UniProtKB/Swiss-Prot annotation:
Pfam families: RBFA
InterPro entries: KH_dom-like_a/b, RbfA, RbfA_dom_sf
Gene: rbfA
Top-level taxon of origin: Bacteria
Subcellular location: Cytoplasm
GO biological process, one term: maturation of SSU-rRNA
Gene Ontology, cellular component aspect: cytosol
Species annotation: Paracidovorax citrulli (strain AAC00-1)
HAMAP family: RbfA
Main location: cytoplasm
Protein name in the entry: Ribosome-binding factor A
Family assignment from sequence similarity: Belongs to the RbfA family.
Amino acid sequence: MAAKKSSTPNRGFKVADQIQRDLTELIRELKDPRIGMVTLQAVEVTPDYAHAKVFFSVLVGDADATQDALNQAAGFLRNGLFKRLHIHTVPTLHFMFDRTTERASDMNALIARAVASRSKDDDEA
C-alpha cells in the first residue's frame, strides 16, 4: 500500500517558517540577561511535528550561555507558540548555536590569505 501523501505540499516548511517568526517575537519578550542579541537562522521541524531544531546566532554575548538560557526557556516559548499556532502538535524546541557565520568568516580569511600569497608569488616572478 502506498504511503499517504500530505494534503498540503511543503506544509513542514510553512510551519517551520511560522515558528521562526513567532519565536523571534517571543524571544524578544524574554527578560533573561543571558539572552542578548539573538538572530534565528533556521528552524527544522520533524515530519510528525514532535521536535524542532532552532538554529540561532549571537551578535553580542556568550553563545553557550545563550544556548543554555534558550533551552531552559524552551517550555515557556513552546507554550507561547501553542497560543499562536493553530496546529495540533507544537514541537519540543531544541536550540542549537549556528556556526555558519564563523565558518564563512574563516573561509573568507583563508581565501584572502591565498590571494595575497598568490599575488606575492606573482610579484616575485
